[in-house]
From Swiss-Prot:
Region Disordered, annotated ranges: 120-155
UniProt xrefs under CDD domains: PIN_YqxD-like (cd18720)
Stated family: Belongs to the UPF0178 family.
Name assigned to this protein: UPF0178 protein ACIAD2644
PANTHER family: UPF0178 PROTEIN YAII
Lineage: Bacteria, Pseudomonadati, Pseudomonadota, Gammaproteobacteria, Moraxellales
Length: 155
């Protein structure tokens, strides 16, 4: 197994991305842990695990931050979690394939706060569109590239 792990913020993970993650685990012999406040329906194995946390705001996020190590990879669309992962020396990837950086996380946090302000004022902001096949390909590519980069870095 590799010297780093893959953590998945599974509460809001689109189902079509699970197969991408499981294939990557097989291909790279990578340990994956799905963390959610509900049963994610993943069959555990030597490399695949799931942790069910108590219901509550950000419990799964906190579990990931508490358990992850530097160089681990985290799949999340939660911007504050991505910021914590980066701060702790990990790599965070959005389910649409964007690899978070210190710069783009700050920009996304500002945008998120602005959108929260708009929603608080009663403005309907809508949500993101469903994950497309193109998004799935971009996520798969970003995940593969990140795993390979981490393999070289930790070898």
């Amino acid at each position: 197994m590799l010297p780093f792990k893959l953590w998945v913020d599974a509460d809001a993970l689109p189902r079509i991305l699970r197969e991408v993650i499981l294939r990557a685990s097989d291909r790279y012999q990578l340990e994956v842990t799905f963390v959610a406040n509900q049963n994610v329906g993943i069959t555990p194995s030597v490399r695949i695990k799931s942790i069910q946390v108590m219901s509550g705001a950000d419990r799964a996020d906190q579990e990931i931050v508490d358990r992850m190590q530097a160089n681990d990879i985290v799949i999340t669309q939660d911007i504050p979690l991505a910021a914590q992962v980066i701060e702790k020396g990990g790599i965070a990837i959005h389910p649409r394939g964007e690899v978070y950086t210190t710069a783009n996380v700050k920009a996304r946090l500002h945008l998120r706060d602005f959108m929260d302000t708009l929603r608080g004022a009663g403005v309907q902001t809508g949500g993101p569109p469903p994950i497309s096949e193109r998004d799935k390909r971009e996520f798969s590519s970003a995940l593969d590239q990140t795993i390979l980069k981490q393999k070289r870095k930790t070898a």
